[in-house]
Structure formats: C-alpha cells, structure tokens
Curated annotation (Swiss-Prot):
Belongs to the multicopper oxidase family. Cu cation 1 binds at residues 107, 378. Cu cation 3 binds at residues 149, 380, 428. Cu cation 2 binds at residues 109, 147, 430. Cu cation 4 binds at residues 375, 429, 434, 439. Pfam families: Cu-oxidase_2 (PF07731), Cu-oxidase_3 (PF07732). Gene3D superfamilies: Cupredoxins - blue copper proteins. Its main location: cytoplasm. It comes from Staphylococcus aureus. Its cofactor is Cu cation. Induction: Induced by copper. This is Multicopper oxidase mco.
Length: 447
C-alpha cells in the first residue's frame, strides 16, 4: 500500500505532466508584414540524366524586427531554404554541404528513399564537410519537407531556421491552383519566442517541447497574405518544434481539403477545420470569391490569428465612386464641435450647388486625440444615396434613399446628393446639442 509521501509524489508528477501538456499562449499576427515565398531551386541536368542540386547549411543574420538582427541558420541563405520541385521518376543528385560550426544531417521528411540517404542521426556531415547523395523519386505527388536530424541538436537547428519544402509535383491534370507563389502557396507556420526582439533558443528551450509566443509564416513575424486570386491553394506545413495547430477560417467558411502528408486524397473533402501536428502537412483550397468581405483570417483554436488573408481584387474594386465635389469634416465633442473647422454662422453660405445637379459629397468623422464620437449627419431638403463607406460598398441597411448617415470616429462615406428645389438649406450633426453648439452649415441651391 502506498504511503502518503508516495501519494504526494505521484500527485506532483501528475501535475507536472499536466502543466507540460498545456499550450503556451500564442499572440495573434497583427498583419504588418507581407509574406514572401521561398525561391525554387533550379536543378542542373548532368549527362547521366540526373537533376543535380546543391544545398548548403549555413549561418546567417535575420532582421525579424527592424534594427534587430538575430543569429539564424538557413539553407543557401540566412533563414529557411529553397523549395525543391521533383516529379515521380526523377533521378536526383544532391550535394550536401555543412557550413555550420557543428554536425548536421539532411533529412528528407516523408520521402520514400533508401535508408542510406534518408538523413537520420547516423548520417552526420561534420563542419566544413560535404557529401553527395543520389535517389530516384518513386512516389506520387505530395508536399514534403527537409530539415536537419542530428542527435541531440535537431530541435535547436530547426528552431534557428533550418527547414525547407520539397514538392513532388502533380503528375496528372486537375483543377487545383498550380502557379507557384501566385495561387499555389507554400505556408510554413512556426512559433518562436524573442528575447529583446532577438531569437534565443537557449533561453526559451523547454525539454518537453519548446513553444513560442510569436507566430511566423515563411519566416515573417506579424505576417499577412495579400492576393488577387479567386482560389488559392495553401500547402500548409506545421514547422513548429512542439505546437499543435487547429486551423480554420475566421468567417467559418469551408475549404476543400485535397492532400495529406502522403499526397492527394482519393476524394477531396469540404471541411471547416483541420489539425496539424508538428511536422504535418496538409493542402487546402480556399475560394476567396465566395467571401463577402475583402479579408479573412486563418486562425488557430478559433481565436489566434495565424495569417490575415486580404483579397486585393475585392478591396480594390469596391470603391468605384466618382470624383468628390464637396468635403465635409465633422469634428469634436461637447461644445467644441465644428464642421470643416467652423461653427455655424447664419450670415455665411458654406457651399453652393445647382438645382438638379448630381454631386458626390465626402463626409468624414475626424478621429481626434480624444478618439471622438459617433456623429449622425443630416441634410435638409433632399434625400441622398450612400455610395461607399471607407471605400467599400454600403451595408444592406444603408441602401435606399436617406437623409441621415451615422459615422463612427475615423469613418468616411461618399454620398450622392441632388436638390430638386432652390433655396438655402442646412446640413448638420443631428445630435441636437451639437447642432445648438454650432455643428451646422448652409448650402445655397440655385438655378
């Protein structure tokens, strides 16, 4: 029978296990930095029909944050590595060069090849040394990757940047997007922690799996993706050391799941969420043309933004309004309120307009140092049409003829204004106290 000390120890051990299973908080991407895509490494063809490549593991410097350079590792560059594109039946020769200060290997994750060239811990390449491997590609289309596998330094070397993608390309015609870097997009997701805005694996290492608080996509912090494409194919790689990812779209839109680690599914599936374990790959196709919005977020666990996706085609095509004829700036709070920097003067005419002339007015609720407040803007003697709000088509409840539009601080609207009668008319904020405090102007409509 266990004594109390043994029970306490067992309880403590269980608590330790529980704490190690908990996910470290991951901060959302702020969408500040446009992601780029790894270059495709072009092969040389030798006389024996081999596609010939050279990969160098090397040290580098990477500016994750402006003015702050981190010591990183990369293949043929400062961080990450180029994409290799192969096809079933290809004969491949790769010269592997170790320009690091420590042992490394080159492991071909998911590639079905002879164990002698798999790149496991027993196939070490020492600092300053190189070796050449050969193999034939015998498997179907898939998204694979390569990374170091030296014992006991795999985690450190991957965390510091040694990762790259290897495609076995589609060998049959399908309708999947296939233009690399345009609509066929490699997406390497990783999480890291920065100490004083610099990468430092030693200070953040966790023996039960190092998880970071900062998301990176293709080596960019605060990543975003801007595209004009209607459909995009994301080749997702969870390149994190330890973090599981549960990915979905923030608008709850479904996507087409087309491939797993081993290649294309026999039958694609419509899903709204997928799980990516560390090292896993999955391919999905997102139809951005079905979105009402011009932006959607790829999120983890319903909340953490991994990658904001901006549909440039939607956002650039929405504001097709004509040139602006008049500008109205609503400013202030309390009794310090103005239109175009002026308080109402009954002896002043602020604007003129011809009767039956169609004009475009731009109404802006200026956001000041105090943040401002919502202002409902009203025009006497006419009903106007809302053309756009912040450059986008107005919401359904703003359709139809209107004589008042309410704008939040910082919002800007364009409206179409036609007067059918002549005379002098007021325009003003319809918070009545603001109107009384001078947030009002006059327009004279003439023949």
């Amino acid at each position: 029978m266990m004594d109390m000390k043994e029970n306490d120890q067992k309880r403590n051990d269980m608590m330790d296990m529980k704490s190690h299973d908990e996910r470290k908080n991951l901060n959302s991407s702020q969408g500040k930095n446009e992601i780029t895509f790894p270059k495709v490494l072009d092969p040389k063809k030798d006389n024996n029909g081999y596609k010939s490549y050279t990969l160098k593991a090397q040290k580098g410097k990477t500016e994750f944050y402006k003015g702050n350079f981190s010591n990183t590792l990369g293949y043929n560059g400062n961080l990450l590595g180029p994409t290799l594109k192969l096809k079933k039946g290809d004969k491949v020769k790769i010269k592997l060069v170790n320009n690091l200060d420590e042992n490394t290997t080159f492991h071909w994750h998911g590639l079905e090849i002879d164990g002698k060239v798999d790149g496991g811990p027993s196939q070490v390449i020492k600092p300053g040394k190189e070796k050449t491997i050969k193999f034939e590609v015998k498997q179907e289309a898939a998204t694979l990757w390569y990374h170091p596998h030296p014992s006991p330094n795999t985690a450190k070397q991957v965390y510091n940047g040694l990762s790259g993608l290897l495609y076995i390309e589609d060998d049959k015609k399908n309708n999947y997007p296939s233009n690399y870097g345009k609509n066929d997009l490699p997406i390497i997701i990783q999480d890291k922690t920065f100490v004083s805005k610099k990468l430092n694996y030693t200070k953040t290492k966790d023996e039960d799996g190092t998880q970071g608080d900062t998301v990176l996509v293709n080596g960019k912090v605060d990543p975003k993706l801007t595209t004009k494409e209607g459909k995009i194919r994301l080749r997702l790689l969870n390149g994190s050391n330890a973090r599981d990812l549960n990915l979905k779209l923030s608008n709850n839109q479904s996507f087409e799941y087309i491939a797993s680690e081993g290649g294309h599914l026999e039958k694609t599936k419509k899903l709204k969420e997928i799980n990516l374990a560390p090292s896993a790959r999955k391919e999905i196709v997102i139809d951005l043309s079905k979105m009402k919005e011009d932006k959607v977020n790829l999120v983890d666990n319903d909340e953490t933004v991994i990658l904001p996706i901006i549909n440039k085609e939607k956002s650039t095509n929405k504001d097709t309004t004509p040139k602006v004829d008049k500008k109205i700036k609503l400013e202030g709070m309390d009794d310090n309120v103005t239109i175009n920097g002026k308080k109402f003067d009954p002896n002043r005419i602020d604007f003129t307009q011809k009767v039956n002339r169609k004009e475009t007015w731009e109404i802006e609720n200026v956001k000041d140092k105090m943040s401002g407040m919502k202002h409902p803007f009203h025009i006497h003697g006419t009903q106007f049409k809302v053309l756009s709000v912040d450059g986008k088509k107005p919401s359904e409840d703003m359709r139809g003829k209107k004589d008042v539009i309410s704008l939040e601080p910082g919002q800007k609207a364009k409206i179409e204004v036609v007067f059918k009668n002549t005379g002098t008319y007021m325009f003003h904020c319809h918070i009545l106290e603001h109107e009384d405090n001078g947030m009002m102007g006059q327009i004279k409509v003439t023949k």
